[in-house]
């Protein structure tokens, strides 16, 4: 999993780095909103130069944003990223009260995920790795190794799961 994280607290950035390295994920971190956007736009441009325009390749599997970061805050960063790439997976990781954060991100008009700080390591990694989605797909008899090899994006996995749920509801 390749993750871009915008976090102003140096100790927290270090924690993310250790955590993601431990689970063999790739982390690129930014200390503020401007740096995050610069990294995101650079990576998006590099991908566009290397791939066919019809392919929907994401520069990052997830972008994790602290709600309050210097310069442009997490909400502004999310708005700009989603404006250029509406399929990008965004996760807000914040110590803010969940209700306040949910109200703020509602204005994005896009599905974003929230994780409350402090979070436990397993919860965060499972969220990044779509562990719960894979568990549910396996209940439908799907071969999880085949699905992982196909390297579906988070959005595609959720769409597959949604279709399977709807098919299960239909009368035979």
Task: Write out the residue ranges for each language-model feature.
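Acidic, metal-coordinating helix/loop segments flanking the phosphotransfer/catalytic sites
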Residues: 29-62
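Acidic catalytic/metal-coordinating carboxylates
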Residues: 32, 73-76
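Alpha4 helix (beta4-alpha4-beta5 surface) of REC/receiver domains from two-component response regulators
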Residues: 76, 96-114, 122-126
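CheY-like receiver
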Residues: 134-172
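Active-site residues of response regulator receiver
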Residues: 66
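Two-component/phosphorelay signaling modules centered on CheY-like receiver
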Residues: 10-35, 41
